[in-house]
């Protein structure tokens, strides 16, 4: 009996080696900087492409926030401005590698950053969206 066949026989008896179809969903925030030469239609089409990709791979879009055209702190690919887009979504942890590949392949994307949100950041974002003042915001008297 080879090591591989012994290991697969051993692994077949334990459920922790099997893939779990009910994977735990994690909360993420994605910021993408698109090239500023996009038209409004292309900008929206790029956003829809990535939201559809998230949904097609078992994720759920929580909130979408297009910031529009902003100045960059330093030039990226000889561009001094970029179209910013922030997306909050829920997805399994193995999904982010697939999303990264899609973002790197897209010629309209200058930069991107995906961040895993902890429960406090999720609560903060939900409160901020609902209009409830958070601890860091000043309440006008």
Language model features by range: what are they?
Residues 3, 20-141:
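Structured, basic alpha/beta domains of bacterial-type, RNA-associated proteins
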